[in-house]
Structures are given as C-alpha cells and as structure tokens.
Regions:
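Bacterial N-terminal signal peptides
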Residues: 1-3
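Auxiliary tRNA-acceptor-end handling modules of aminoacyl-tRNA synthetases
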Residues: 5-216
Length: 216
C-alpha cells in the first residue's frame, strides 16, 4: 500500500476532477469526481472505496442499450431490456484487500429478536470478488477494477438466465471493451460493448450494455 504522496506521484492529478468528467481511456478525460471517484491510468480502471461506503448496499441494474441484430427470443433481446439485477456490498477483509459480497435476502429476522443469531449463521452472504488494495489515502481504498469490468461476468452484465434465453456463448475479448465510466453523487454508470459467440455456431452477437450501480 502506497502513501498519498506516492499516489500523486503516479499521475493522479486531483485538480482535474470535475462533476461531468467521463473516464474513458480513448479520450483525454481520465478522471471523474463522484461516487467511487473512478479514474483511468495507463489503460487501467480504478475505483476508490471510502470507509463510509463499506458495508453499504449497492443495487446493480444492467440493461441493453443497443441490441444485436437478428438475435431475439420472442419478446427478449431488445434495446431497453433489463438483463440483470443484483445487490452487492463492499467489505474490508484487512488493510490489503476488500471483498465484494452478493446479497441474497430471501429471509428476514428482527435484529433484536432471539432468533437473529441463528438467522445470521444460516445466511452467510457469498464472496464473489476479492480486490487488492493498491493505495489508501484520505480514508479511501484504491482498487483496480479493469479485469472485472472487461470480464465475461454475470456480476455486472447478462445474468445466466438472460444468456440462456439469448443463446449467448463465450465473450469475444478482442471484440469487447469498456466504453466509459461516469460518476454521479450516488451512482456509477458503466457503458460497455460486448460481443458473444452464439451457441450452435450461429455467428456473433454484439451488444451495447449500460450497467448502473446505485447506492441505497
């Protein structure tokens, strides 16, 4: 973990932050002021997770912004369709690593009730990602999210159900990319281009996806 001065020496110019800045490695705008303070350095995407946002719930919603031609399943596969939703929570493992848990809330219990300890023991939320802390400054943990954003994952993009309905096979990494990451006061908006091989050797399908992370 490096100090704040070392972080600045790595090229993070705080003075260029602006509320309307888009993080996009193809443009000159590489910093964004807003939720998670996303920025891009040498082609890598980074987020800063403040102490105050640990153990808070985040709602993820992924929609098709622009749909692939010729790949429909009755009423599915159109622009505007919601293809994933989930609830997440960042958690500190230690000073060198953060966990991301996917929250499954099928059961409830009163925190003041006698059954609550048993409820907690029967509802351990799954750890779906572990991020190394690259720097810590101003009570914020800097993590590299590049591989996560670029991956073929149902944590951010098409759910397993949606992939099955649309007959999507593996992601074509060389034909997929992160287009932009935009930060606001309570949410982060991620735009990506994703290309998939269709099951059964039926060709390729390219989608523009819009993923939102909203702090609840």
């Amino acid at each position: 973990i490096v100090s704040a001065l070392q972080t600045q020496a790595m090229g993070i110019d705080m003075s260029v932050y602006g509320p309307d800045t888009v993080v996009n490695k193809q443009s000159g705008k590489l910093f964004a002021k807003g939720m998670l303070s996303p920025f891009c350095r040498e082609g890598r995407y980074y987020w800063r997770i403040p102490d105050s946002l640990l153990d808070r719930d985040w709602l993820l919603v992924c929609r098709i912004e622009a749909a692939a031609a010729g790949n429909r399943s009755r009423n599915d596969g159109y622009a505007g369709d919601q293809v994933n939703t989930a609830l997440y929570r960042f958690e500190k493992k230690n000073d060198k690593q953060l966990y991301l848990r996917r929250m499954v809330l099928n059961e409830r219990a009163d925190t003041s009730g006698v059954i609550f300890p048993a409820y907690r023991k029967s509802n351990v939320q799954g750890i779906v990602m572990a991020f190394d802390v690259r720097a810590y400054a101003n009570e914020e943990y800097e993590i590299d999210v590049t591989d996560w954003l670029q991956s073929d994952t149902d944590l951010l993009y098409f759910s397993a159900t949606a992939r099955g309905v649309l007959r999507l096979g593996g992601q074509q990494r060389d034909k997929s990319e992160v287009l932009s990451v935009r930060a606001y006061d309570r949410n982060v908006e991620i735009r990506t281009q994703k290309t998939y091989a269709l099951q059964g050797g039926l060709g390729m399908a390219t989608y523009l996806l819009h993923t939102s992370l909203l702090l609840l």
